[in-house]
């Protein structure tokens, strides 16, 4: 896997993105929330709201399979028909995920050390969306140079359950406070876990 920095996004950056059709170039919705599949560590899709300052929630959702492209400024789909009513797998995940939001969860190492609390989820947009790390704050052991937050890479497989998120203790050496350099940190961390190399 090659991680390019321009393809790394915070999940919160996607909130408010217009959903635009390739068919007519029309912005038909906005991203309301990002639906994160905690068991799969992946982005499953989006809940939506109507466009505009007072736009309320929409009944339709947008599954990732229907997304043609995702950039820093818009979510592109083929046509308005790609939005689905809330009776599919995505809607079920939204229902089940209530009460187990990753944001504000504690991050602990498998050695029992508290690293901080999740403030955002970092997503790699490549062949498919993959959650590759967390932005965390409130750390007493990690001291960022600026902004008070750091980025913690995740292993290739990570099951999330309960109130705390557990990461390998080796993550210490791969934490960064720079999102632009975070992709390289993810690759080095995963290589280290696979091979045990420094």
Language-model-detected regions and their locations in the chain:
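Peripheral interaction segments used for macromolecular assembly
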Residues: 1-198
């Amino acid at each position: 896997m090659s991680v390019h920095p321009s393809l790394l996004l915070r999940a919160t950056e996607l909130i408010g993105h217009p959903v635009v059709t390739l068919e007519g170039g029309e912005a038909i919705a906005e991203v309301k929330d990002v639906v994160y599949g905690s068991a799969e560590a992946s982005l499953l899709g989006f809940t939506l709201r109507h466009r505009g300052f007072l736009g309320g929630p929409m009944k339709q959702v947008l599954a990732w399979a229907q997304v043609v492209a995702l950039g820093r400024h818009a979510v592109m789909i083929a046509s308005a028909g790609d939005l689905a009513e809330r009776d599919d797998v995505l809607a079920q995940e939204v229902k089940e995920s209530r009460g187990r939001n990753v944001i504000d969860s504690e991050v602990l190492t498998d050695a029992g050390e508290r690293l901080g609390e999740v403030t955002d989820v970092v997503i790699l947009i490549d062949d498919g969306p993959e959650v590759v790390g967390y932005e965390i704050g409130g750390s007493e052991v990690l001291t960022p140079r600026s902004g008070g937050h750091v980025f913690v890479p995740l292993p290739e497989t990570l099951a999330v359950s309960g109130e705390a998120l557990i990461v390998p203790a080796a993550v210490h050496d791969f934490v960064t406070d720079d999102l632009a350099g975070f992709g390289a940190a993810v690759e080095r961390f995963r290589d280290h876990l696979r091979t045990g190399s420094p």
